[in-house]
Design a protein with these regions (language model features):
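Catalytic Walker B motif of ABC-type/P-loop ATPase nucleotide-binding domains
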Residues: 5-8
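ABC-family nucleotide-binding domains
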Residues: 15
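Helical segment within the ABC ATPase nucleotide-binding domain
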Residues: 20-32
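H-loop/switch region of ABC-family ATPase nucleotide-binding domains
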Residues: 40-41
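A short, surface-exposed alpha-helical micro-motif characterized by mixed small hydrophobic
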Residues: 46-48
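ABC ATPase "signature
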Residues: 64-65
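ABC ATPase nucleotide-binding domains
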Residues: 79-100
């Protein structure tokens, strides 16, 4: 069992069966107290696996905390430069682009 697992875009370009397999394995390791560091642009990955999120822009931390603190309209607007609306309904996240 690894003490630390470092992942870079762990489910990018995978079919859904493979994505769920990876997510399940990462969750299993997390329950065994493996520390997991993951780099990803996929918000849906973050919400299924990780309890702490650090958001970086230009190499600087712009947000750090749990999902509910970090994944919000202000942070995503700042990070990506687009206007979005973020809602969380009992763990079901929805990110909608706002078009002017």
């Amino acid at each position: 069992k690894p003490k630390i697992l470092i992942l870079d875009e762990p489910i990018a370009n995978l079919d859904y069966k493979s994505k769920f397999f990876v997510i399940d394995k990462v969750n299993e390791l997390s329950k065994l107290n493996t520390k997991i560091l993951c780099v990803t642009h996929d918000i849906s990955t973050i919400t299924k696996i990780y309890d702490r999120v650090i958001m970086l822009k230009d190499g600087k931390i712009i947000a750090d905390g749990d999902q509910n603190k970090v994944i919000n309209s202000e942070n995503l607007n700042n990070l990506y430069g687009i206007q979005v609306e973020v809602t969380n309904n009992n763990g079901l996240w929805n990110i909608k682009r706002l078009i002017k």
